[in-house]
């Protein structure tokens, strides 16, 4: 419903107000190739694998069967597919395409990505935490923008975004200096270094994740 409302709203704006096909905003018919499915899973799995090089322990939380079902469903359907599609529709579809039409592709890739990073700043964050999350958010935004530019559609970046959310922040796996009892599996690091843990924002803004964004962007 969440995705349908957003895509329906975008369709009405494009068709009725702007008189521009959705395809011009890189929002066409969904089409997924095996390569992008592999890439979508490879990025979070690479991050998890690299963390195994650092001292820590795996811990499994004891969750009721119904709680686990709800956790998996929410991770896949909402934080994964829905959030990935909606955020890519807005940032890589509408905003990036509009900026590209107004200026050029380079600005279109960078400007919305920095905005994407800034919007992940949360109340109560320290200054280093803010800097860290803006850098990480901007880089992953640039990665998704490059994927969209290369393929000509938002659907591959939405797939990568969705799988990342599902595995890394959806409640299935948590990596940090302390366990989260609401998450199914925890990898508890022996260090509390903000570079490795991601500081205030978490593993998504860690140097390991940032390195993964850069590797896949190249």
Regions found by a protein language model. Give the residues of each.
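Small-polar-interrupted transmembrane alpha-helices in polytopic inner-membrane proteins
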Residues: 48, 80, 84, 105-121, ...
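Membrane-interface helix/loop boundary segments of multi-pass membrane proteins
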Residues: 86-111, 146-153
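Functionally important transmembrane alpha-helices
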Residues: 131-195
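Hydrophobic residues within alpha-helical transmembrane segments
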Residues: 78, 111-118, 131, 135, ...
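Membrane-interface starts of transmembrane alpha-helices
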Residues: 1-2, 103-112, 153, 201-204, ...
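Active-site His/Glu-centered metal-binding helix of metallohydrolases
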Residues: 85-90, 94-95, 99, 118, ...
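Specific transmembrane helices
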Residues: 1-84, 169-218
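Aromatic-anchored segments of alpha-helical transmembrane domains
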Residues: 44-52, 113-123, 163-171
């Amino acid at each position: 419903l969440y995705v349908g409302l957003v895509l329906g709203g975008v369709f009405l704006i494009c068709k009725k107000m702007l008189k521009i096909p959705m395809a011009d905003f890189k929002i066409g018919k969904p089409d997924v190739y095996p390569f992008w499915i592999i890439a979508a899973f490879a990025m979070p799995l690479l991050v998890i694998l690299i963390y195994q090089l650092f001292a820590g322990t795996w811990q499994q939380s004891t969750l009721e069967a119904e709680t686990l079902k709800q956790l998996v469903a929410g991770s896949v359907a909402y934080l994964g597919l829905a959030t990935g599609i909606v955020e890519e529709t807005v940032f890589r579809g509408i905003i990036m395409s509009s900026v590209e039409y107004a200026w050029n592709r380079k600005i279109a890739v960078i400007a919305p990505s920095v905005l994407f990073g800034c919007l992940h700043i949360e109340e109560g964050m320290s200054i280093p935490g803010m800097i860290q999350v803006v850098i990480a958010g901007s880089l992953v935004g640039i990665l998704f923008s490059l994927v969209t530019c290369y393929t000509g559609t938002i659907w591959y970046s939405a797939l990568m975004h969705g799988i990342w959310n599902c595995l890394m922040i959806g409640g299935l796996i948590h990596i940090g200096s302390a366990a989260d009892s609401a998450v199914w599996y925890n990898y508890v690091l022996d260090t509390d270094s903000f570079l490795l843990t991601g500081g205030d924002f978490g593993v998504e803004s860690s140097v390991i994740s940032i390195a993964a964004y850069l590797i896949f962007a190249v």
